């Protein structure tokens, strides 16, 4: 984007207050990202935010977000946010553009089919039961940490199902939490801050290097091994072929897709589960309704994938926590001049939107800040504006693993509530922490056997 084009865009788009020299709004975003992204709606439908010296134009309404993600999706590529994540996830689905994205999506989509998720559900159930079995009556469990471990364990077991994959499983357990902790700030901050000799940078760089190195070795070893009779993601990716060209994925492409699944899947599931339990203990009426539903649908046996579509109360709770605690910020870049609402943006313009802010907009949702799962009852769901709820994105960039997350989270909620009653441990009120999605700092709870 030329200086002249940038000036024309700047002349018609309101700039958010609070920018400082060199850093722009990066410091404000770092200090309180959730408050900042929610404040932008009050400044217009499109608001300019400066990340360092880079202007970013933030769309704040469901209609404009739909323009970016669906109606004019082919006029956008992944933007700076994803450029900054490329050292972690390479050119996996989250980062790929154009024909590369379409090719990889065709090849990866079958791995999240209904039949595959049925297979993965056995791992989800087994890990949920192991988690519930590990708790002792009267002990305090950090639910945020427990759900993070469950989500990472399930992803790792789904990706690497043999002894050969154990080094990768251990690398995921050790390094993924370190990377997720600093993901948003790293992606949104000016690149020169990466070089500051501070512990956060050292830990991040070390974890990224270790994780990529171990997964590279496991992928190469699996390729040499040549076995194709397993159903883990690694084996499926190695065997995948493009239906048009007949070409498979290179080892680097396999590594990139595995990394993408890790970053996209672990934090979303863990956050949704932790917030679900947190919200339910404050609403015993809803918890009792869910427990009654579990007893009616599941009984005292194991929760299976056949039960998932019938556990409708759990689905409404998960919908509501994903609305309240969703994706913090996503970015795109225009590839051609784009008309976005009343604003003409030239090619090369960085554009962003916050699902977290959009899903909490009081102009869109009645009692937007309140936890109200019944807003997702069929008779009330119609009142939600079209395109206003997209927890997994929309259009050709919608997350292909959404059914994986719904299934995994439903099985976990039902398994835990079937066995345990949770109550808040005194002395701590959970606080929101902005990362790729909004998770809690800690949610300590006392667990007691359910009568």
Question: Where is each model-derived feature located?
Answer:
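Cytochrome P450 proximal C-terminal region
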Residues: 2-6, 10, 128, 174-177, ...
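Cytochrome P450 catalytic-core helices
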Residues: 268-287, 291-293, 403-419
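Conserved cytochrome P450 K-helix E-x-x-R motif and the immediately C-terminal K′/meander segment
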Residues: 23-44, 213, 301-341, 362
């Amino acid at each position: 984007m030329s200086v002249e084009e940038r000036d024309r865009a700047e002349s018609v788009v309101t700039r958010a207050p609070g920018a400082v020299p060199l850093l722009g709004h990066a410091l404000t975003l770092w200090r309180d990202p959730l408050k900042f992204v929610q404040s932008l709606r009050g400044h217009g439908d499109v608001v300019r935010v400066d990340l360092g010296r880079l202007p970013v134009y933030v769309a704040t309404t469901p209609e404009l977000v739909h323009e970016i993600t669906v109606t004019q999706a082919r006029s956008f590529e992944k933007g700076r946010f994803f450029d900054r994540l490329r050292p972690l996830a390479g050119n996996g689905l989250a980062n790929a553009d154009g024909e590369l994205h379409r090719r990889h999506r065709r090849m990866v989509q079958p791995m999240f089919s209904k039949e595959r998720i049925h297979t993965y559900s056995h791992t989800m159930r087994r890990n949920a039961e192991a988690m519930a079995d590990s708790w002792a009556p009267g002990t305090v469990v950090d639910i945020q940490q427990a759900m993070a471990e469950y989500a990472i364990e399930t992803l790792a077991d789904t990706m690497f199902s043999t002894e050969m994959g154990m080094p990768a499983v251990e690398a995921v357990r050790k390094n993924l939490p370190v990377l997720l902790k600093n993901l948003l700030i790293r992606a949104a901050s000016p690149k020169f801050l990466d070089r500051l000799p501070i512990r956060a940078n050292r830990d991040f760089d070390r974890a990224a290097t270790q994780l990529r190195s171990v997964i590279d070795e496991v992928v190469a070893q699996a390729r040499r091994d040549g076995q194709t009779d397993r159903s883990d993601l690694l084996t499926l990716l190695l065997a995948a072929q493009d239906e048009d060209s007949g070409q498979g994925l290179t080892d680097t492409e396999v590594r990139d897709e595995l990394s993408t699944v890790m970053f996209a899947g672990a934090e979303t599931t863990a956050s949704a589960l932790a917030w679900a339990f947190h919200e339910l203990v404050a609403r015993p009426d809803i918890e009792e309704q869910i427990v009654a539903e579990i007893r009616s649908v599941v009984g005292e046996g194991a929760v299976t994938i056949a039960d998932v579509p019938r556990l409708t109360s759990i689905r409404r709770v998960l919908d509501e926590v994903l609305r309240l605690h969703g994706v913090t910020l996503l970015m795109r870049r225009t590839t051609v001049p784009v008309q976005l609402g009343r604003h003409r943006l030239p090619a090369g313009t960085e554009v962003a939107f916050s699902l977290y802010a959009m899903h909490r907009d009081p102009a869109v949702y009645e009692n937007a800040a309140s936890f109200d799962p019944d807003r997702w009852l069929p008779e009330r769901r119609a009142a939600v504006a079209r395109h206003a709820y997209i927890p997994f994105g929309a259009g050709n960039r919608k997350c292909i693993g959404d059914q994986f997350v719904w299934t995994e989270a439903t099985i976990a909620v039902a398994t835990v509530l079937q066995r345990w009653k949770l109550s808040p441990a005194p002395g701590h009120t959970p606080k929101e922490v902005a990362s790729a999605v909004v998770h809690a700092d800690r949610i300590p709870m006392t667990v007691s056997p359910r009568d």
